[in-house]
Amino acid sequence: MSQPFVLAVPSKGRLQENAEAFFARAGLTLAKSGGARDYRGTIVGLDNVEVAYLSASEIAANLARGSVHFGVTGEDLIRESIVDADKRVALIDGLGFGRADVVVAVPQAWIDVRTMADLDDVTTGFRAQHNRRMRVATKYINLTRGFFASHGVVDYRIVESAGATEGAPAVGTAELIVDITTTGATLAANGLRVLDDGVMLRSQANLVASREADWTDATRETARIILDHIASRARAGKFKEVRTRFSGCNDALLAEAHAKFGVVSPFGGPTSSGMLTLHCPPAQLYGLSSFLRGHGAETVSVVSLDYVMDRENPLFAKLEAFLRS
């Protein structure tokens, strides 16, 4: 048997639940043959696929090494832990969960420090006054260095944080922090605020592909099938299917509907009997149905879509372009 296609997903908590739900919505059911405590699984109905349950940081490391083909992990971990990430991995698709911003946060008492330029001035003055560099507590060492360098901030020292980073200024181990936040409530509770231009990265969970993985014809085909499921589900989420039939339905009316409502005609124009199927953005449904009824339609039905499968697969095309580059 050939080497399996390996998909790495988070091993616990909300990230695992969200990842499994994401794949399930795309028609890809992840199953653990050994029960909930098993760290290996499969995708039901797909042969020679191994699902590896790992921590988010382990997933990033395995993607860098090429020991997994696809992994679900946060962009923040990819950017922090993989040098030249854009050359070694591809962010195939943002999954819409695990959202968090990597930010620069300073004490609320620093009323004159609103931007990174202000911080540059303060760090220079701090060193002159205290004969030491200002301390920045963070787990994101590489992201911090890159972001600070891009803003010309050099008079600082990183204090690597192993725990609750937001508490570092209060206990005196750092003057400011770089950390992740979702709502900012924890920062505010610790007397901190984000600089106006201090959002370093808006992160979310991504489906990530590794360049170093063993990309055979078989594993590429497995990737195509997985990405076809995901793209089909995503495409379906953008539209509702609208059906109607009336004698006044013609190509000119269809062209007007396209222009006004952004509809797609997946099966072409109206049939000889006036039967028409359209895919319509949800926000345009009422306007479209009123338009069709105003031109003679007696009945307009609306159907939710589970999958819309096109010949073109933009996600697989993105993967192929990355592997060729």
Swiss-Prot record:
It is found in: Cytoplasm. InterPro entries: ATP-PRT_HisG_long, ATP_PRibTrfase_cat, ATP_PRibTrfase_CS, ATP_PRibTrfase_HisG. It is an enzyme of class 2 (transferase). Pathway: Amino-acid biosynthesis; L-histidine biosynthesis; L-histidine from 5-phospho-alpha-D-ribose 1-diphosphate: step 1/9. Keywords: Amino-acid biosynthesis, ATP-binding, Cytoplasm, Glycosyltransferase, Histidine biosynthesis, Magnesium, Metal-binding, Nucleotide-binding, Transferase. GO terms for biological process: L-histidine biosynthetic process. Signal peptide: none annotated. The keyword DNA repair does not apply. It comes from the Bacteria. It catalyses: 1-(5-phospho-beta-D-ribosyl)-ATP + diphosphate = 5-phospho-alpha-D-ribose 1-diphosphate + ATP. Its EC number is 2.4.2.17. Feedback inhibited by histidine. GO terms for molecular function: ATP binding; ATP phosphoribosyltransferase activity; magnesium ion binding. CDD domains: PBP2_HisGL3. The keyword Metal-binding applies. PROSITE patterns: ATP_P_PHORIBOSYLTR. GO terms for cellular component: cytoplasm. Its cofactor is Mg(2+). Belongs to the ATP phosphoribosyltransferase family. Long subfamily. Catalyzes the condensation of ATP and 5-phosphoribose 1-diphosphate to form N'-(5'-phosphoribosyl)-ATP (PR-ATP). Has a crucial role in the pathway because the rate of histidine biosynthesis seems to be controlled primarily by regulation of HisG enzymatic activity. HAMAP family: HisG_Long (MF_00079). This is ATP phosphoribosyltransferase. The gene is hisG.
